[in-house]
Amino acid sequence: MGITGSLTPDQLDFFHSQGYLVIESFASEDEIRGLRKRMDELLNQFDCSVSSIFSTKNQKHTTDNYFFESAEKISFFFEEKAFGDDGKLKQPKQLSINKVGHALHELDPLYKDFTYSSKFSSLASSLGYRRPVVMQSMYIFKQPGIGGEVVPHQDNSFVYTDPQSCTGLWIALEDSTLVNGCLWAIPGSHKNGLVRRFIRGDNGITFDQPSPSYEQKDFVSIEMKAGSLIAIHGDLIHQSFENLSSKSRHAYSLHVVESDGCKWAKDNWIQRAKMPEPLYVLP
């Protein structure tokens, strides 16, 4: 099938030089409203007696079968600070979930329609993909008051192919600001290559190298209006701080890899019985 790329030469130049690109008004108000409404429905149906705690600081969830099995399911992960000393939720479950993942784009019809729409195919085509596959999808809440920090990282660490091919696509479903925990990145850091990998072995998952230290002065804040999308190169160093405000920061995030000539690593944390359906296939 023929796919027409949606990015201009200037946009592509910025992406390749800086390692990221913000596209405003990527999602319409109706699409945002629909995605958020559907997530409310999923949360209301969710049995919170079966779940896991998510943290990028403490990787204890990585030995959790619930986490492994989420690769091909719609699974719910609590914020670290959602529970009191008595082990009970300190607020309603709707305000306690860190994220929902990792197969929304396959298993929920509304999220699948949005993910497999022509706008994502056009974007992937502009970025040079021939047979792009969405390996994971996440709805991220960044809850008010307890939304956890996401430490500096590279997406290729977690979503690794040989050769490397990951691009993160992150859509703001609410305004993302300095107040509620917007993204930060080190422009051009993707040119330095991959620092470390997150590897699944017999004893769970660990990083193969310690985390480097980064100077906060090297990061720039990336504030975004609801409906905007940021494309993130797989080697770009990026992070977000805790959300200590009274406002949430909902987002829908995808990680795309090339399946034409790129091999999915057997020691990635995501190991699936079947690869997802590609967004499109070029001849």
Swiss-Prot record:
EC class (word): oxidoreductase
Names of the cofactor(s): Fe cation; L-ascorbate
Documented EC number(s): 1.14.11.18
Keyword annotations from UniProtKB, A to Z: Dioxygenase, Iron, Metal-binding, Oxidoreductase, Vitamin C
Binding site for 2-oxoglutarate: 99, 138, 153-155, 170, 240, 249
Function according to Swiss-Prot or TrEMBL: Converts phytanoyl-CoA to 2-hydroxyphytanoyl-CoA.
The protein's name: Phytanoyl-CoA dioxygenase
Domain of life of the source: Eukaryota
PANTHER family from the UniProt entry: PHYTANOYL-COA DIOXYGENASE DOMAIN CONTAINING 1 (PTHR20883), PHYTANOYL-COA DIOXYGENASE DOMAIN-CONTAINING PROTEIN 1 (PTHR20883:SF15)
